[in-house]
Amino acid sequence: MFKQKPLWRKPALFAGIIIGAVAFSCQQNTESPITGDSIEFVKFQSGDIIPGKYIVTLMPTGINFRKDLSYDAVQATMRKTGSELLSKYRIDQENLGFVYGSSIEGFAVSLTEEQYQAISKDPSIKAIEADRVIALGPPPGKGPGSGGGGSTASQQIPYGIERVHGGATYTGSKKAYIIDSGIDSSHEDLNVSTSLGFNAFTKGKDASLDSDGNGHGTHVAGTVGAKDNSVGVIGVAAGVTVIPVKVLDSRGSGSYSGVIAGVDFVKANATSGDVANMSLGGPISDALDAAVVSLAASGVKVALAAGNESDNANNHSPARANHANIYTISAIDSSDKFASFSNYGNPPIDFAAPGVGILSTVPGGYASYSGTSMASPHVCGLLIWGNPGNGGNAIGDPDGNPDQIAIR
């Protein structure tokens, strides 16, 4: 079902880095646990297995074919199913975390080793994998820049938007789901719909969908759809509605189980033709890949960052996930040169896009970031308009098979 790919050289997760006008706060925040859990992510490194936390995939129950069920109804049904399975093994229902029924069928759960050994033999279970921390981090050898928040004196068209032939104003009904750290809903350059969004966090400073405590998701959203409004920057599909799906907290940290919950929400609520961007990733997860493939199979086009490890993208999830509606994106610079940090490999990579020194929106202003996290939303914006075209080849692709540069 999936493109084959190897594990990362080290369990680092990928995203963009700050190289421009703003530096984000990364203070420890222990007040934003994943729903149903009590995880303090600061205790873990990116890619670490979270002790005692698991993602259970169930054998098909047929719930996905019951089109009459709303997202809330599916959630209730799967929570009942999960609770009944746990009670069968005398496991407390409070151990049950996120539940999934719109993409994969299953749930997140806390288990002792003894409970894991017992429940894993149940015939209703297809697979169990360890939950992991997922966190944003810089490409190898890079680090965050410094500086204060900034605004642009007048509207600019970033070089990446020009390179992919974006910037036209979108007036249709398609929506862009940004599966990330949230989006600053007050930003004057973005058309944000929080009422359609999802938040994996239920308390602390990350519980509000109106804010983005990290800034990464707001930057991604601006590349997709910043308005043509005489200020700031212009996105690839200017003015498109961007929807926050907050699965990363203010430190840029979350869990695989929370990311799957976000994907599950989008699968249940998006319309065929909508798009989604996932500028995040980590070690291989069959459950995460399966959820993303299910989302793509519903008609939602998904842009995925290839990763920043200078590694084969086949070693990472969800970058390795394969479907006709999935586009895995590597990064180039303003001279079309393949970025030194970018992951590579065909498959899974479908296109390259600008990902070095990308100016976009951040809470309170604008900043330049680098990473495949910045390349992916260029293609996400293109997918609003249709399938990307061929704008030439990336220069110096290390796999010897140059990635096509995506354009409208």
Where are these regions (language model features)?
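Active-site core segment of subtilase-fold serine proteases
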Residues: 142-241, 258-261, 265-274, 327, ...
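Post-signal-peptide N-terminal segment of Sec-exported extracytoplasmic proteins
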Residues: 43-92
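Autoinhibitory propeptides
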Residues: 87-153
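Bacterial Sec-dependent N-terminal signal peptides
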Residues: 2-3, 8-11, 16-48, 139-148
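C-terminal subdomain of the subtilisin-like protease fold in secreted/lumenal serine endopeptidases
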Residues: 234-237, 244, 268-291, 298-300, ...
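Short, small-residue alpha-helix embedded
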Residues: 221-224, 374-389
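Active-site-proximal beta-strand/loop segments in catalytic clefts of secreted hydrolases
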Residues: 57-61, 99, 111-112, 129-133, ...
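Substrate-binding/specificity loop regions of serine endopeptidase catalytic domains
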Residues: 138-143, 233-234, 253-259, 278-350, ...
